[in-house]
C-alpha cells in the first residue's frame, strides 16, 4: 500500500508494541472464532465502534460546552480550520507529562499538526475516562495504532463532522446522536 511513496511506511517506538498487541488480539480472536476473517472483522468492528462513539461524544460535548477542559477538540469556536486544542494545546488542562509537552511543541514546530491533533485527541479521551468511565474506558493498547485521525483531510470524518453538520443540529442530542448511530449501522 505504500507504492509510490519515497520510502516504505514504517512503524517505530510505541507503535511496534501496539502492532504486536494487535496481532496477538487477532490471534486470540481467531482461536476463539476459528476463522481469521471473522476474527479480523470482529476486531475491526470493535475498534471502529469505539472511535466512532468517542468522536460523536466529543463533538457533542464541545458544541454544548460540556468538555471539562473547556477547549474544543475537533473544531474552533471562531471558525478556524485548526481545532482549538491544536492552536492552544496547553489551555486544556490534561495533565501532560513533560515528554508529552515536548512532543506537542516539536510536532507543532515541525508543522505535523495532524500528528499533534491525534495525540491531543487521545489525551482528551483518556482524561474523559475519569468523568465518563463507561464511554471513555481505557482502550486496548493496540487501538490508538488503528486511529487514523486528521483534521486537514477534507474527506476525513473530522472535517465532515465539523463542516457538514451545523452546530445547531448538535443542540438536540437525541436526534443527532440517533441519526448518526442509524447511519453508522
Model-found features: residue ranges?
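Preference for the N-terminal adenyl/adenosyl cofactor-binding alpha/beta module
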Residues: 1-185
